[in-house]
Amino acid sequence: DWLLDEKNIVKKNHALHQHLGLVVASAVLRDRSALNVAYDRLAKQFKSTFDTQGANDEGAVGYHEMNLKWWAQAWSRIEAEGLKIPDFAVARLEAGRTALAHMVLPNGTLPQIGDTNRLPVSKGLGSHVDFVATQGEEGEAPEGTAVAYDRGYIVSRSGWGTTRPLADESHMLVRFGHDVLSHSHQDRGSVHLYTRGRSWLTDSGFYSYQTGDLTRTHFLLRDAHNIAQLPDLAHTVRAEVSLERFTATEDVHDAVLHDH
């Protein structure tokens, strides 16, 4: 009854785990009505968790990866109870795997965006992720070398290891969009640059979940990210950084941002 009451449900990935708790309780108690409630909640939340491009809503690449794992498990549990995974969920989950492959650095590690640790990307998240996780030994490369995700990521890379080792490719990721909160930082407008086998511009990434920790507070701020600062101009901390133009050809990847 507690999990069925909407007022007890929180947000984001915490809500996902509550819904899964309801799935398990419903299965044990053979309560089909409660199971259907959990199913409807999962379907509704998934539409906001991953958009049609496959971008996650938490503002951190590490949480993009974790949500792929959590939701794959969630839909597997739903299937085990005899329910069908919604077609849109299948499509968005696959798009999310491809999006993660684009975001991962050429050396196979996660870019430190938002609350993300500097770790290798996990295998087993689809053929595109396996490709970057194994330096091209398994899986297959995604199509294209540049993409702009509406949820605030521009990704540009020199290639997928066809003319040189994958780890020697260049990679740039730029953040834009509105203030996401959740596990994001004040990093809109920041630039991440990897080339010649190493990261040259990187951000603070995950430090701690302790909200009163002054070091964590600093690592969330614009000052801890690769953002152009103009001291003489006023800036609104939570203002949107909009993508004014994005063009990708075989020769040029071009983007223009407007920091309000």
Label the predicted regions:
Residues 10, 161, 179, 207, ...:
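Short, solvent-exposed loop/turn segments at secondary-structure junctions
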Residues 184, 188-255:
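Active-site rim segments in enzyme catalytic domains, especially the processed small/beta chain
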Residues 18, 67-70, 224:
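Catalytic-loop motifs flanking and including active-site residues across diverse enzymes
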Residues 1-62, 72, 130-142:
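Active-site lining segments of carbohydrate-active enzymes
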Residues 23, 51, 55-201, 251, ...:
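Carbohydrate-active enzyme catalytic cores, enriched for enzymes
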Residues 11, 56-60, 182, 210, ...:
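Alpha-helix N-cap/helix-initiation motif
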